[in-house]
Amino acid sequence: RGVPMIHLSTPGVAGLIGGSREDSPPAPWGAYEESKAEAESILQSVLPPELLTILRPDFVYGPGDRHKLSLFRQVRRGWFPLVGLGGAKLRPTFAGDVSRAVLASLPGGILGPGLWNIGGPEVVSVAELVRAVAAAEGVRLATIPVPRVIFGIALALGPLAPRQLSRSRLQLFGKDHWVDIARASDAGFHPETGLADGLSRTVSWYKSEGLL
């Protein structure tokens, strides 16, 4: 108590929706998101508002991150299964911009106490994202539209299902889920790294580490 806290949460607390705002009602869609929602609630119950900053960075990628590595590796193979036509929207956010948001949340920074959505400058479709990844990797990519019903059949196979047709892929790449960053923008915080630049830097790091 008495010490400011910055908590990194997730937009998934508000569910899989497009344009979620800081005041969107909670609707966590998975165990991870439920744990983050509970953490937010606990912190809000024990800390006074002036000591708590909660950041919800959206779809984070960048050097040092391995959570999105499977996406980059799948694109590297030259083909990528899309949920439907890959039209679901998301907002990729470069890790460096998340670090900037944390610094901006320190005492005296432009992001004061409260809840803030943090996102990249572009909202793109899944199809646009994987093509941008392919461009950064310098590979030709074939995108394969997979009807939702096929994903459903694959999920019914359980452990026998191809990992490219997983439940998490259906959820993350099959529905709009991106944040509205107007509140942070109004406070003067703006993302600096665009998608093409961020992906190029990420691919370079993966290659330098022998991961691609």
Role assignments for model-derived ranges:
Residues 1-31, 50-53:
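Conserved Rossmann-fold NAD(P)-dependent oxidoreductase catalytic core, especially the SDR/UDP-sugar
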Residues 4-9, 53-59, 91, 117:
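Structural signature of the Rossmann-like NAD(P)-dependent dehydrogenase/reductase core
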Residues 18, 28-40, 61, 65, ...:
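Short-chain dehydrogenase/reductase
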Residues 40-63:
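Conserved beta-loop-beta element that borders a ligand/cofactor-binding pocket
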Residues 65-70, 84-107, 113-117:
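Substrate-positioning beta->alpha
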Residues 72-83, 139-140, 164:
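A short C-terminal helix-loop "cap" of Rossmann-like NAD(P)-dependent dehydrogenase/epimerase domains
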Residues 95, 115, 131, 154-191:
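Conserved C-terminal active-site "lid" loop/helix of NAD(P)H-dependent oxidoreductases
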Residues 105-165, 199-212:
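Mid/C-terminal beta-alpha module of Rossmann-like enzyme folds, strongest
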